Amino acid sequence: MAKKIVTDLELKGKTVLVRADFNVPMKDGEITDDNRIVQALPTIKYIIEQGGKVVLFSHLGKVKEESDKAALTLKPVANALTEKLGEEVTFVPETRGETLEQSVKDLNEGDVLLVENTRFEDVDGKKESKNDPELGKYWASLGDVFVNDAFGTAHREHASNVGIASNLETVAGFLMEKEIKYIGGVVENPDKPVVAILGGAKVSDKIGVITNLLKIADKVLIGGGMSYTFFKAQGKEIGLSLLEKDKVDFAKELLDRAGDQIVLPVDCKVAKEFSNDAEITEVSVDDIPADQEAMDIGPKSVELFKEQLQGAHTVVWNGPMGVFELSNFAKGTIGVCEAIAELKDANTIIGGGDSAAAAISLGYGDDFSHISTGGGASLEYLEGKELPGVVAIANK
């Protein structure tokens, strides 16, 4: 179902509430990665150009008690927005009250205001995270329309997304629209053939995704730590490699059901320790030494996965192929990333999380059709679940 977007509204003179995702990594009060702020700019700039008054909401981190607040204020985000927009962004260090209400009333057309971290409301009864109806109603009372542009929290039913939406006309911002188009498109109406590449440490994190993608994808390539549970299910010895014993039966059932639809690595890199100084050996997946751990897929597996990608019209990737943080065990992830980036005629999508960070850090950010800003939200969407934040947006 197509959703209404910000361009469907008349915004001039309106107070436009925007739920953005400014949950950025911070160190000593400094933002270390501003990607989420950059991604929010097109929607904010459009509302400014249309003569709307922008009131921004976002969470940052987890706020459990009063002492958490100082390190999790959105003030650095307000400063970053001021710099990127080239105009002063008013920061209100409160989530409710007269100062906030008056500051909103004082806005002129084209002005931007950022409300303090919505999760400050969690200190007293988790009002944000539990979608307190009074809080959602109060925030909604500050504006005329609501634009939800925070895909990263779309799988959560919070006061600042679903709560406001239940009290105010709600549309998608440009980033949310893009996420629905690409991530939702994989699930609902993909351009075939579809190849999915899944990595990461645990099968348990991806059970729903694997199960759903096997209904959609022509091939599901599995790498990373989770692949060794599948090898165990095939009766292979995996040495000290990562194993989820309680998921071996599930992996066996999937392999029996899916047949050659699931493609596993054929070789891997093993070592005795997690270290860039460790002695590395490339071995067949049939020859993993008993005293060593597999930490990356090998070069033959990268070539195999490249072959499987040829001719794909849609590719979705979620999860690294090895211990990407260590350069010794990053080549599998780099190889897969490069192979996908070279597919110029395919829809290439990264489902957030570590694979997104890998692609961006390797300089391939612009070579993918879409890199999702949502980790958990992307996974739940790929599982085929309805996301509360998306459901709450008005249909066209």
Curated annotation (Swiss-Prot):
It comes from the Bacteria. Monomer. GO terms for cellular component: cytosol. Pfam families: PGK. Its EC number is 2.7.2.3. This is Phosphoglycerate kinase. One of its GO terms (biological process) is glycolytic process. Gene3D superfamilies: Phosphoglycerate kinase, N-terminal domain. The keyword Nucleotide-binding applies. One of its GO terms (molecular function) is ADP binding. Belongs to the phosphoglycerate kinase family. CDD domains: Phosphoglycerate_kinase. Signal peptide: none annotated. Its main location: cytoplasm. It is an enzyme of class 2 (transferase). Pathway: Carbohydrate degradation; glycolysis; pyruvate from D-glyceraldehyde 3-phosphate: step 2/5. It comes from Staphylococcus saprophyticus subsp. saprophyticus (strain ATCC 15305 / DSM 20229 / NCIMB 8711 / NCTC 7292 / S-41). ATP binds at residues 206, 325, 352-355. It catalyses: (2R)-3-phosphoglycerate + ATP = (2R)-3-phospho-glyceroyl phosphate + ADP. HAMAP family: Phosphoglyc_kinase (MF_00145). The gene is pgk.
